[in-house]
Amino acid sequence: MAQGATGLGTTLELLLQDFRHALRQLARSPAFTGIVIATLAVGIGSTTAIFSVVEAVLLRPLPYPESDRLVRIIERPAEPARDIGYQQSLAAIWTRDLPVLRAQASTLSHVGVYAGVTAVVIVESGSPPLRLEGTRLSPAVFEMLGARPALGRIFLSAEETPSTEPVVVIGYSMWQQYFGGRPDVLGRTITVDGKVSTIVGVMPKAFQFPDAQTLLWTPYTLDARMARIPPIARLADGISDKAASSNVEAVLRRIRKTEPRFPGSTSISAPSRFEVRTIQEHLVAPVRPLIVVLASAVAFLLLIACVNVTNLLLNRNAARCQEVAVRIALGASPARVARYVLTETLLVATCGGAAGVLFAFGSVSLLRTLGTSLARRDLTPGVSIPRLEEIRIDATALSFTVAITVCVGLLVGLLPVVRYALARTTTLDLHSAPSRGGRAALLVVQSALATMALVGGGLLVHSFVKLANVDPGYDARHLLTFTLRSASPAGSIRLYQEVADRLRALPGVKAAGYAELLPMVRFRTGGPLAPARPMPAGTPPPPAPIDMRTVSHDFVSAMGMRIVAGRSLREGDPRAVLMNETLERSGFLGPRALGQQVLVAGRPGPFEVVGIVRDVRQYGLDQNPDPQVFVDARHLPPGNPAPYFAVRVDGDPMSYIASAREAVREIDSSAALDNVATMQQVVSNGLSRPRLFAVLAAAFAIAGAFLAAIGVYGITAYAVTQRTRELAIRLAIGARPRALLVLAIRRSVAWTTVGLFVGVAGSVALSRYLQGVLFGITPADPVTFTVVSAAFLVVAILATLIPARRIARVDPLVALRTL
């Protein structure tokens, strides 16, 4: 026992000696130590940061009990061959059919709906109105989320009926900020969108739904407005997604056959396919491919950093071979020397890991700042990274950092350790060094990895440039947009038209109109459509669902949308509709849609198709146009949320904000402009997600290329140092410096070029996995490959020229005398 303790003590003492000696050696060469630590910090820190994104967005369950049972219903065209552009979306049902879905979908234990709103709130009588983020939801939503209030209660089932007294549940932050955290807040009344509502509950600080910005919740009442909204549900115990999908599809198809009935029409919409998908999967599906691409880019960056550090360590150890040879000659075993080298490597890796943690903290903070600043939630909801506020460096991320640091330390120290462990004294003299083949292999690997990273980043950047230049189908220039919020009860179509007329009368205003939704505002408002008369046999059914756009008669001209056939809506013909080119091409009205009559779900008809509108990309520039119909806003159901206004002006749209506010106040003194932005800002905000990922991918790729260039520089500098005597002799016998310069860089450039070709080949093989995140280009885009290859080759050549230029300044006599 004592002997074992003595052996352990001896081992620990030797390790401590190795540690102290390694610390002294690293302190003697601060430049080398700083470069290695910085290189590892970038690699390990970037890896930790992207791991925190993957863990928070893709892996971490939602913060609700049994969150894997919370589901949304996805609707797709039943026949893929008939998919004429309608994108995968949430299935929507009429609110009147919600009880039917609850009763017949036996695989779902709870079914409800919710919708985010910007509510106008008056906390106390006489206080100014506040515009706070809120959510209208069914009482069943609180139940399925397992919500437990900190004070009071949640909504009762009966409170989703219109006849009940208005109630509200407030969030913890609203309770603290506006009520001082007083427990007597229950029973107090506040005015929410013109309705005096009683506070019945306060949610705990940790509760967030649907996001952290929501401050209050009101019941979603199932009234007669005939709104269409996507449901949210919880699976019953023991029910799989597949079983629920089958049950829900059968129920929704029965519902679709009965809603709404089109008198005199024998045509029915084409059937749809429905499937149940977990909420987490629905949230992350749009960003998963992009996050995987970023994770791959960071993996390449980490590998480049490891290769770079390995090369630096090999060169450093080569310069210390005489010291190592003396140690072995004095009795130290190769294994003892190898252990010391490993200790030094792990020490520098630990320092790099510690610096990497700081780098990761900064990177995550920057990511959250960029994600928040680049995507305004009020303009285009759903374009930022989901669960962005949950991304952080926590204990899980730090544990990952420790693991990756140890792995990196072992990886970069492997070659030097093996070299010394297998060494003999006779081979470790002053001139021993890494073999030429070893240096060439490192150079090829670095160049190949950097090329692949640059190609991936270049493809994303090129794709974003293509996306940003897509024609949206309207003119976004010189266009001011906003919503109208009032402390009085919900406005009427007459009020909205008065506002539009007053805006149109302002000097410099060319056109003004309003619509239920703007393009790029990612909510779908779909429903069935049918011909008003029987169609000949063989006529295809209408596509399902069809995007319904409720607009004022002057909205089309204000947006700069182009009528390709027929005319636009007029003030005197409320029974007229417009349809887009995609819907016309579906052929459900025969060869010519213009002049035909249709029945529109939820609205008294029939309606005449008076014009065909050029396709507009309503849900994003990367989304194909859906089949769309434009209905006059006079059919907007009463009580609907305030519409979006579009005002076309001369000059800078933002300079018209003050006059627009004044014009609105002249009509309604309690009204104010909300969500104010130019249409160009709205479009740009809709591009925030692909822009952010393109910037991050490019940054990681450039960082990888920079590290690779440093590696090329280091290998070339070492080669020049090793060949100084040979080059000095050549200079002494008359060789020209330029010829020696070419001789010095020839091998580095040659092996870099080989690595470039290997990287291009690897990029061709791997870039096909980017197919789903690219727009307007192919994964083998020749422009990107050419530009990236040329740019990296230029950078690599410059990296070799910098150390090689020292040859021209070499004095042969001095060089020969010092060697």
Task: Locate the predicted segments by residue.
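Alpha-helical transmembrane segments of integral membrane proteins
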Residues: 2-34, 279-284, 312-339, 343, ...
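Short, strongly hydrophobic transmembrane alpha-helices
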Residues: 30-57, 61, 66, 304-306, ...
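Alpha-helical transmembrane segments
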Residues: 42-76, 364-375, 449-478, 717, ...
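Small-residue-rich transmembrane alpha-helices
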Residues: 50-53, 310, 346-423, 459-462, ...
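Membrane-proximal extracellular/periplasmic loop immediately following the first transmembrane helix
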Residues: 62-118, 230-232, 277, 385, ...
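Mid-to-C-terminal secondary-structure elements
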Residues: 119, 133-157, 165-292, 365, ...
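N-terminal membrane-entry
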Residues: 284-300, 396-400, 685-704, 746-750, ...
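Interfacial "coupling" helices/loops that link adjacent transmembrane helices in transporter permeases
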Residues: 305-349, 429-430, 710-750, 756, ...
